[in-house]
Amino acid sequence: MALPLEGVLNPIKRRTDELMVKIRESLFLIQGQDEMIPDSHVYLLGKPDSGDLSLVDAGLMGKGARKIESLREAGVKPADIKRVIMTHTHLDHIGCLREIMGEIPGIELWVHSAEAGPLEAGDDRTVYGMEMFKQMCQAQYRLKAGAFTFKVDRRLEDGDELRIGGESWKVLHIPGHSAGGVALYDEGEGILIPGDVIYADFAIGRFDLHAADSSQLNKSLTRLAGLKVKTLLPGHNRVLRNVPDGYIARTAKQWAPYLS
């Protein structure tokens, strides 16, 4: 049984009218703004004076302008943002990518190799996850075929060391929620950005979508459980500071019977 976590994991507090939340000097959260479909969080990485900033994920359709505006309001020059690094390419994470690219000409797209090929080929099965959801979203948002075809500038692989913004982040391939899911890990500070593989409150990502795999998700959770994590920055919902030892392991153990 899950234990109540309020006050235990010390969630980073946020106001509903505040989109940008400072995690540290070189790391900010741009909060998702959920609608009928969830809008993923976006993270801004890099030392402010480096001129080499990165966004982790983009978010839902129609949210790009507001996210760029929130960056400007915080004093960030969009031209200093050099790349978008995707934790995975589901719709709620990649939906407004083209909007962001329109605001920041020349920005690069970095995606794990398992999802880069389909993205470049216009194979949107991973983006939508299931056919029924695709039909609903195309009708709701007037999305055309090929709307999520992109050129990928860098194909990420497990173990890559990303030296960006005056810092270093390790790429961990954590499939299961999606084929090309990745986490970014700052080992020195114990900061983990796991996309939708694990959340607060002992929750994990779905494993019933296209290219999802429950056994792979189980292995990915087990792998993450072996990391030293002090701050957990998921793709949705609460972000967590002062994560107790064993939190990810307990989450993995709780879900293991459903993932085997």
What are these regions (language model features)?
Residues 20-74, 183-195:
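Conserved beta-strand hairpin/beta-sheet module of binuclear metal-dependent hydrolase folds
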Residues 26, 45, 57, 88, ...:
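Divalent metal-coordination and catalytic microenvironments
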Residues 29, 54-57, 83-85, 171-173:
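Short catalytic-loop micro-motif centered on adjacent basic/acidic residues
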Residues 54-56, 85, 109, 191-193, ...:
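Residue-level marker for buried hydrophobic side chains located in beta-strands
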Residues 60-65, 72-160, 251-257:
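Active-site HxH/HxHxD metal-binding segment of metal-dependent hydrolases
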Residues 60-62, 161, 168-255, 259:
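Metallo-beta-lactamase
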